[in-house]
């Protein structure tokens, strides 16, 4: 089947909030990006360059681009929400929502400077500006075990503090729900939130509560975003083209 979706329309996403009834906003096309055109023309031969037409074999099960790892669903998010950087049709990296970026090898930190863009509703009306905090909110969503993001490993392996934050809440959820692993590992939590993980041989480790402020992503101001890495990973810029690093409109999460 074929469907036409506007680059500036709002995706009604059933899974983006815990109630599975929240909506994901679309970003307007970046100034440095090529606009996507319709694959079809009118009788006069003109092409509607405000529409992007895509063919797909079945309906997406979700439009939650922060959690899905299904090709069909990832295509929707990739075509509708801008990333910090992107590749052109020759495979050359160029500006996306970021106008420039810098690497500090001493602190293992990338700094991105954002252009002014907006979230829009299903009528193309501006809802709010896109800010660095939208990237922070989206990454926190990805790292929250309750939302079961299939792409969380693309974050925990590279962003400083992300693995500790994610693992703590996995362990806490296990303790709260009485999970016992196949190997006999058990989880308990005290009133202060300290989790004890006890293996079948009696060996125990404790994990104190972890605040999201310890994760290596910061909104310095509305248009400045930083990522601090666990190590100097040369492919991090490419990684930013993947869905878990896309922004999301915070009030809708």
Question: Where do the model's predicted regions map?
Answer:
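Surface-exposed binding/hinge segments that line
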Residues: 134, 141-253
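N-terminal lobe/hinge region of extracytoplasmic solute-binding protein
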Residues: 55-105
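N-terminal secretory signal peptides and thylakoid transit peptides that target proteins
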Residues: 2-21
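Solvent-exposed coil/turn segments that connect beta secondary-structure elements
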Residues: 57-60, 89-90, 106, 115-117, ...
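Short, well-ordered beta-strand elements
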Residues: 48-58, 109-112, 225-226
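Bacterial lipoprotein signal-peptidase II cleavage site
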Residues: 26, 30-41
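Extracytoplasmic/secreted proteins, especially bacterial periplasmic and envelope-associated proteins
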Residues: 75-79, 92, 96, 130, ...
